Amino acid sequence: MTEALLSRAMNDALDPPLLPLPDRVAALLSELGSPPRLAAHLRAVHDVAHQLVEWVEQHSPAVVFDREAVLFGAATHDVGKTVHLDELSGPGSAHEEAGQALLIGHGISPELARFAATHASWMDARVGLDDLLVSLADKIWKNKRVPDLEDLVVARLARATGRAAWEEFLALDGILARIGDAADERLAFQASFPIHV
């Protein structure tokens, strides 16, 4: 039953549609015995990240970022919650470093594993646009607006495009509002899967 629920959370056709998790991530979550709710969360955030990277590519084609890294990071950012189950239903950050170590231990490069540790650390001067996009996807999937995070994304976009920060803010605000409009459906999807089976 657990494997069937996990498979549904990662791959089933849905209304509204969510992209399935990448095969590499789905295989890892199956191997780890991921709680179905975690897989559902990762799928929702991955789908939102996909919308964000498509928007950046269309809105600002000159902006340099690693599309595949952002998508992988969004799909695995909370993988450490497979060992810190209490953080699926309550606050905590132990899953961040644990997730990075878990991914590296399963052969994932440190460059990709870092998102598990950086997705809540957007104020760190070492994070790049890729990290910020993963962090943003992890917030906006549930329509949570974080002005400090959004300001950092706006600044990176304005610097890369040469457009005024207010122009970048208006454009980003528009896409975040559109993505946020479907938050209730994504939250309901996640909540439809159990933590413990």
Region spans (language model):
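Charged phosphate-binding loop/patch that engages nucleotide di/tri-phosphates or the phosphate backbone
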Residues: 167-197
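Acidic/His-rich, divalent-metal-binding segments that scaffold phosphate/diphosphate chemistry
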Residues: 2-94, 145
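A generic short-segment signal for beta-strand/edge and adjacent turn/coil regions
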Residues: 13-14, 39-42, 100-105, 110-112, ...
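Amphipathic, soluble alpha/beta structural segments
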Residues: 3, 7-21, 129-160, 185-197
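Divalent metal-dependent catalytic cores for phosphoryl transfer on phosphate-bearing substrates
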Residues: 30-31, 61-160
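Short, well-structured alpha-helical segments
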Residues: 39, 43-46, 67-71, 100, ...
